[in-house]
Amino acid sequence: MSSLSPASEVILRHLDHFADRHVLIAGDLQDTLASQIQAKSVRAYTNQYHQWLPLLKSMGDNAFFGLAADQSFVKYCDTLIYFWPKNKNEATFQLRSLCASLSVGTEIFIVGENRSGVKSATELMNGIAKLKKIDSARRCSLFFGSLTYQTLFDRNNWWQTYRYDDLTVMALPGVFSQTALDEGSRLLLSTFDDAMVGDLLDMACGCGVIATVLGKKNPMLKLTLCDVNAAAISSSIATLNVNELEGRVIASNVYSAVEETYDWIVSNPPFHDGLGTSYQAAEDIIRLAPNFLKKGGKLRIVANAFLPYQDILDHVFGSHEVLASTGKFKVYQATKK
């Protein structure tokens, strides 16, 4: 088998149990265990576009990407293996959604790294499934139980809203800046003083607040937003709609689904993938930006001040500017010549 996460290695210790089961694997899928596990049938659901793409190649229609798995996709599954994400609210949202579609009696395995907060699974599932801890290894815990109560789930009950700059921001669990605008995005937005026109791409858009603020102030901007997270896609669409703005919102692993070129690429790029720290997405945003910028187009990003993006910007663009700086964040701009 290919390299597996510690949580997946714990699941490997119980492979014999799944041989006669119809398995649904969901949650934070950090590897391709779903395409390698042996069972009567295996399906995989993820809300992360970059996790879905490799599964799609090996599993085809048995891999699902979206905010919530369709009932038709999960109804024949009798076993759920859920990989706990770092965000408890996201786990709650996903498990409530899944347990509304799965049948009573479905076996439930919940696994995750101890530092992720997986030990709160028993409390979270109280009244839905009685879980007990059945294994502990690789600094992970595995819980097991069966579904005793099918939940009621309405995604409209899960929205968080807040106000920023006279705009309404809509966000679902697991989306960055779900309850308030983060300091980095505030600093980035503070650097936009002049009127803007043309085509703008908000990369790693989260709840869509950056594009929404800029679009509201600059009605001649044509907005495109992208993210890997299905919850972010839904949140960005909702944020645009509630503020009466038009924009195209797409799922994309950095630029993988981007087909046009832009006058502006703006981003508050992530530097985490699951529990781990990863700068790959942010570096790819910079390295590949010239391919998606028009001549004279600008990349403007905010990043933690300690991250070494200056050298990458200079290597790719030849030079860069620092438009704003605090002790914690810097806003960089580079122009395609």
Curated annotation (Swiss-Prot):
<keyword id="KW-0963">Cytoplasm</keyword>
<comment type="similarity">
    <text>Belongs to the methyltransferase superfamily. RsmC family.</text>
</comment>
<dbReference type="GO" id="GO:0003676">
    <property type="term" value="F:nucleic acid binding"/>
</dbReference>
<comment type="subunit">
    <text>Monomer.</text>
</comment>
<dbReference type="InterPro" id="IPR046977">
    <property type="entry name" value="RsmC/RlmG"/>
</dbReference>
<dbReference type="GO" id="GO:0052914">
    <property type="term" value="F:16S rRNA (guanine(1207)-N(2))-methyltransferase activity"/>
</dbReference>
<keyword id="KW-0698">rRNA processing</keyword>
<keyword id="KW-0808">Transferase</keyword>
<dbReference type="InterPro" id="IPR002052">
    <property type="entry name" value="DNA_methylase_N6_adenine_CS"/>
</dbReference>
<keyword id="KW-0489">Methyltransferase</keyword>
<protein>
    <recommendedName>
        <fullName>Ribosomal RNA small subunit methyltransferase C</fullName>
        <ecNumber>2.1.1.172</ecNumber>
    </recommendedName>
</protein>
<dbReference type="Pfam" id="PF08468">
    <property type="entry name" value="MTS_N"/>
</dbReference>
<dbReference type="GO" id="GO:0005737">
    <property type="term" value="C:cytoplasm"/>
</dbReference>
<dbReference type="InterPro" id="IPR023543">
    <property type="entry name" value="rRNA_ssu_MeTfrase_C"/>
</dbReference>
<comment type="function">
    <text>Specifically methylates the guanine in position 1207 of 16S rRNA in the 30S particle.</text>
</comment>
<keyword id="KW-0949">S-adenosyl-L-methionine</keyword>
<dbReference type="InterPro" id="IPR029063">
    <property type="entry name" value="SAM-dependent_MTases_sf"/>
</dbReference>
<dbReference type="InterPro" id="IPR007848">
    <property type="entry name" value="Small_mtfrase_dom"/>
</dbReference>
<dbReference type="InterPro" id="IPR013675">
    <property type="entry name" value="Mtase_sm_N"/>
</dbReference>
<dbReference type="Pfam" id="PF05175">
    <property type="entry name" value="MTS"/>
</dbReference>
